[in-house]
Amino acid sequence: MNKLLLLILFEGVIFLSCSGKSGLESGIPKVSLVIDGTFDDKSFNESALNGVKKLKEEFEIELVLKESSTNSYLSDLEGLKDAGSNLIWLIGYKFSDVAKAVSLQNSEMKYAIIDPVYSNEPIPANLVGMTFRAQEGAFLTGYIAAKVSKTGKIGFLGGIEGDIVDAFRYGYEAGAKYANKDIKIFSQYIGSFSDLEAGRSVATKMYSDGIDIIHHAAGLGGIGAIEVAKELGSGHYIIGVDEDQSYLAPNNVITSTTKDVGRSLNLFTSNYLKTNTFEGGKLINYGLKEGVVGFVRNPKMIPFEVEKEIDSLSSKIINKEVIVPYNKESYEKFLKEFI
């Protein structure tokens, strides 16, 4: 689906700018949110949507939502610019290249991107990126998985292999090994964030192989995995991602590795609107310390003593006593140091 959704005006008054004061002098500012895929993914995109919706509690804005796809990124962004958007949010690493391109082409516009994959190259002054230490939250849920697994086998189901999902994977695997060096971990990618059936298929195979807990980071594929866990019933568990996904299968979702995209988006935009200053040209990084990543407490399935251990681990991560790996290289280094 590739349609433009215009939402009603929200309450409040705001002013926009870019690395200084904005050219906006009157009228109601327009904030746009562009995603790859659909807003109803019950995870990443939905979290971003919820974040901008919360702005209505403080500000009067016109919110424009756009569901896009790779072959229409440029035309969609051009349309939003021409429609008068003051700030355009791009949700997901797939927008990394196009975000830099349009920022350089349209210096009068303001852009923000979630999960960009940039190395050390300069970032345009009218672009800001939000990155996350998702591995820190995944470390905690990996620890939980290893502690509560009955079979000694746990799994990881990823979407598209790359920096973003790898952070979840290796954080999860490291946390599990930190809890139990003998735990068996099986990880697999399905090559998509929109293939529900592939997620179902891989999850079914993992459960049949004796894995009793799967952490997913696969978008709709993960929703398929949750469905399978629910259908199979007791003894088949799953760890959600980005948001608390326990409502999808209350008896099977042990916890979720949270990456509060919506909160980070809301924090930055709120400050932007209140101060009339856009702090672009940089990446802003969030983790456990900032309260943006973490895990969902679930006394029903997580023993009290394990939650106490998690609290201690969280402090060690925040204080940098434990440095959580985010890719294969740092994971192998972690194993040599801690396991």
Swiss-Prot record:
Lipid attachment residues per UniProt (N-palmitoyl cysteine): 18
Protein topology in the membrane: Lipid-anchor
Keywords: Cell inner membrane, Cell membrane, Lipoprotein, Membrane, Palmitate, Signal, Transport
Covalently attached lipid (S-diacylglycerol cysteine), positions: 18
SUPFAM superfamilies to which the protein is assigned, alphabetical: Periplasmic binding protein-like I
Residues passing through the membrane, by range: none
Leader peptide range in chain numbering: 1-17
Pfam hit, one: Bmp
Localization, UniProt: Cell inner membrane
GO CC annotation: plasma membrane
Predominant location: membrane
InterPro entries per record: BMP_lipoprotein, Peripla_BP_I, PnrA-like
Reported function: Immunogenic protein. May be part of an ABC-type nucleoside uptake system involved in the purine salvage pathway.
Similarity comment: Belongs to the BMP lipoprotein family.
Quaternary assembly: Monomer.
Protein name in UniProt: Basic membrane protein A
Protein species of origin: Borreliella afzelii (strain PKo)
Organism classification: Bacteria, Pseudomonadati, Spirochaetota, Spirochaetia, Spirochaetales
The encoding gene: bmpA
